[in-house]
Amino acid sequence: MQDRIRKIIHVDMDCFFAAVEMRDNPAYREIALAVGGHEKQRGVISTCNYQARKFGVRSAMPTAQALKLCPQLHVVPGRMSVYKSVSQQIQTIFQRYTSLIEPLSLDEAYLDVSESTAYQGSATLIAQAIRRDIWQELNLTASAGVAPIKFLAKVASDLNKPDGLYVVTPDKVQEMVDSLPLEKIPGVGKVALEKLHQAGLYVGADVRRADYRKLLHQFGRLGASLWKKSHGIDEREVVTERERKSVGVEYTFSQNISTFQECWQVIEQKLYPELDARLSRAHPQRGIIKQGIKVKFADFQQTTIEHVHPALELDYFHELLEQVLTRQQGREIRLLGLSVMLKPELQMKQLSMFPSDGWQ
């Protein structure tokens, strides 16, 4: 554990896009609802409400598949400008309590309230106040996790969803990590989980007791990362947007995909709108230098392509996708990511858009 005990809050809006639609249209509140593309245009689901999730509908699922699982599903097109506006209102609420805010997307953020004087510095009371403000002012619900380290705050925010709060106090960190199923740790996907299980590793305590060198040999960076997390160590700071050199979004598929068309649907209908929204919200005045695509294959090999391009353009990602898939070699795809490198405010620096520790 770090010497300085931090107070980290992870706030995650509940089914954000769908929740905004239900708020603005009462007729949607009691039905299975999804925001996404039309099945006739080979659309994909961006998000869905909890009624739809009961039928197995999930984000990034083809709309046609979602309708097979839930024939009564009502699919509406996204209103990104509205979601951006609501996200800005949420950010304004965050700023009442701390300036150390790391937005992860329109509906999710880390907050470091270690030095906040609100509510006598109680992170639990601050998290409760944030959730209350969001409900009273925006008529939307948020879930939150509080912990001394980032990854546990994120894990905790999912434990009492929807509209819940979960607090991990410093003295409970190791106990929670020991009992935590590895699939609950951010960055552990389906294929990695199978390999971990084959090695006899199921919960944090299994990793903590494992030999570090063997973990590193078998699992590389993932093994090193899991070993640290299993000891309650996560040294990452809450990084504010003004410190960022790039903006990126990515998605790990619940089932691997293989074709260009499948990749392009997800880029066009999910990843690109999210990247555009995040860029315009966080950095409306800063230009970009490069666009890039990252692909992780089923064998966990990863490749990226980034080219100089001075404006965010969907068509340019089409070109990059064509180029990056020449490296596919028949492999299925488990993750897609898009990124742009921002133009520095003071001087140009030669930095990779996909830093080794930024996309895990």
Swiss-Prot record:
- Cofactor binding note: Binds 2 magnesium ions per subunit.
Positions marked as site (Substrate discrimination):
17
- Identify the EC number(s): 2.7.7.7
Please give the positions of the paired cysteines in each disulfide bond: none
Catalytic residue list: 108
Q: Which cofactor does it need?
A: Mg(2+)
Instruction: Tell me a GO biological process for this protein.
Output: DNA-templated DNA replication
Protein known as: DNA polymerase IV
Species the sequence originates in: Vibrio cholerae serotype O1 (strain ATCC 39315 / El Tor Inaba N16961)
User: What is the organism lineage in this UniProt record?
Assistant: Bacteria, Pseudomonadati, Pseudomonadota, Gammaproteobacteria, Vibrionales
What's the encoding gene here? Answer: dinB
